[in-house]
Amino acid sequence: MKPAVDEMFPEGAGPYVDLDEAGGSTGLLMDLAANEKAVHADFFNDFEDLFDDEDIQ
């Protein structure tokens, strides 16, 4: 017996949108652009060179 959806996700479906409800993939992309988060403004790119292999022993 497979678990029902409400057993797998007891807190609900969450912020996910069905592609049919969003008007297809184009509508989904427009929804994503409209709901841009402010997290990116506080994100600092302080990463060192991720592809620097000189320090590998």
Curated annotation (Swiss-Prot):
Keywords: Cytoplasm, Nucleus, Signalosome. InterPro entries: CSN9_metazoa (IPR029391). One of its GO terms (biological process) is cellular response to UV. Its main location: nucleus. It is found in: Nucleus; Cytoplasm; Nucleus, Nucleoplasm. One of its GO terms (cellular component) is COP9 signalosome. The keyword Nucleus applies. Belongs to the CSN9 family. Component of the COP9 signalosome complex (CSN), a complex involved in various cellular and developmental processes. The CSN complex is an essential regulator of the ubiquitin (Ubl) conjugation pathway by mediating the deneddylation of the cullin subunits of SCF-type E3 ligase complexes, leading to decrease the Ubl ligase activity. May play a role in cell proliferation. Component of the CSN complex, probably composed of cops1, cops2, cops3, cops4, cops5, cops6, cops7, cops8 and cops9. This is COP9 signalosome complex subunit 9. It comes from Xenopus tropicalis (Western clawed frog). The gene is cops9.
